[in-house]
Regions:
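P-loop NTPase motor core
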Residues: 1-65, 69, 79
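Conserved P-loop NTPase
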Residues: 74-122
């Protein structure tokens, strides 16, 4: 059977579901079914920041039922736009919550710690 599944994106999958509660119920049932099958799922979701309220998901409910959240994004540093990765949540694992600059090189992925106070538009 299938052991790994990527859904890109949860936003597209759930856009016609009329309420956050129904989205939560659907994603919980999906996660439970996949776990029963022994399938690891990676759900891709667009995130937004609306004023002081930031979400780690499209609908504001996915993060409550997920085991892990890894954020990929862009940040400006000295006039350059850099990619970053941040592990926000990972159940059963101690991890740094800091942002790391992400660079794709011919030798593979390179992660570099970002300076805590060096951010512009963080």
């Amino acid at each position: 059977g299938v052991t790994r599944l990527v859904i890109d994106s949860v936003t597209t999958l759930c856009y016609k579901i009329p309420s956050e509660q129904l989205i939560r119920d659907f994603l919980f049932k999906l996660g439970k079914a996949l776990a029963t099958l022994g399938c690891t799922a990676l759900l891709v979701s667009e995130i937004t920041s609306s004023g002081a309220k930031a979400y780690w998901s499209s609908f504001g409910v996915e993060e409550a039922i997920l085991d892990g959240i890894i954020v990929l994004g862009d940040v400006e540093r000295m006039g350059h736009l850099l990619r970053f990765v941040q592990v926000v949540k990972m159940l059963g694992s101690s991890h740094a919550r800091a942002k790391y600059a992400l660079e794709l090189t011919p030798k593979g992925v390179m992660l570099t710690p970002m300076l805590k106070w060096g951010a512009v538009n963080d």
